[in-house]
């Protein structure tokens, strides 16, 4: 349990810093004003650049491919994990999936599907024993609304490992679980 809380706090602090960057906030505002959609890959690239320069990140990897366990629900033969992030002095990396959808409910559902996808990876293919985390970027809604979605989708999550955060000066927010 200690590792889960430690990973959560590391990711939360890292992402708080990332989402507070003035240039990133300006781009969020422009995307909203111009109605640009489908920017999940852009977000991942921005995060990769941030991770590369961050003093508390020892290494990171993006789009790591894994074989699926055929005994479990079949999505495809292989699947990619968006990020593995290893904190300095840590032995293993933290898997992080990222989802972006303007509609918060759809974003949360897609995040939950990514957790299921991670659980379908063949154990011998995994790089880490760490629990997977999902970060969703969506339009602002109330915290209660997010919690209601999690109940609706029957997601079992640790209450103190849920982070709902408004991206400063934008119409977006993030959810991490």
Predicted regions located by residue number:
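Acidic-basic catalytic patches of nuclease active cores, encompassing PD-(D/E)XK
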Residues: 7-68
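Active-site metal-binding core of divalent-cation-utilizing nuclease and nuclease-like domains
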Residues: 36, 41, 58-90, 164-173
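Short helix-terminating capping/connector loops at secondary-structure junctions
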Residues: 59, 126-131
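Conserved catalytic cores of phosphodiester-cleaving nucleases, focusing on short active-site segments
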Residues: 83-104, 118
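Short acidic, S/G/P-rich loop/turn micro-motifs used as interaction or catalytic elements
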Residues: 101-106, 141-144
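Mg2+/Mn2+-dependent nuclease catalytic core
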Residues: 103-125
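Domain-level recognition of nuclease-like catalytic cores that cleave nucleotide substrates
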Residues: 131-177
């Amino acid at each position: 349990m200690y590792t889960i809380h430690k990973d959560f706090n590391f990711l939360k602090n890292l992402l708080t810093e990332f989402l507070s960057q003035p240039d990133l906030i300006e781009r969020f505002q422009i995307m909203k004003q111009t109605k640009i959609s489908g920017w999940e890959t852009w977000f991942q690239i921005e995060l990769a650049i941030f991770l590369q320069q961050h003093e508390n990140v020892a290494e990171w990897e993006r789009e790591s491919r894994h074989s699926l366990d055929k005994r479990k629900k079949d999505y495809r033969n292989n699947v990619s994990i968006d990020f593995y992030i290893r904190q300095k002095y840590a032995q293993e990396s933290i898997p992080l999936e990222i989802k972006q959808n303007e509609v918060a409910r759809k974003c949360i559902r897609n995040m939950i599907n990514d957790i299921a996808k991670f659980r379908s990876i063949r154990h011998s293919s995994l790089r880490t024993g760490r629990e997977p985390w999902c970060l969703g970027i969506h339009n602002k809604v109330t915290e209660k609304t997010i919690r209601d979605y999690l109940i609706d989708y029957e997601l079992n999550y640790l209450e103190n490992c849920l982070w709902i955060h408004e991206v400063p000066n934008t119409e977006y927010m993030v959810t991490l679980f």
